[in-house]
Amino acid sequence: MFLEELKPVTRELCQQPIAFAGGFVSGVLRLKLTDDPLKKWLQKQGVTDFSGADINQTAQDNRPQSIDID
């Protein structure tokens, strides 16, 4: 059962190991792709799309949300 949950991770690791490792390391180190040194390096590498890289959360986003179930 636990192995079933790891299948998507292992599939991505096998398909694109370098991209997976880079994403994993940047996540562990909490690097933001829009920070200046990393952003300049990525632009030199040809990456220009940072649309999903920066998640701006305000204090209101961190509080519990209420939902209505009909």
UniProtKB/Swiss-Prot annotation:
It comes from the Bacteria. InterPro entries: UPF0426. Belongs to the UPF0426 family. This is UPF0426 protein ssl0294. It comes from Synechocystis sp. (strain ATCC 27184 / PCC 6803 / Kazusa).
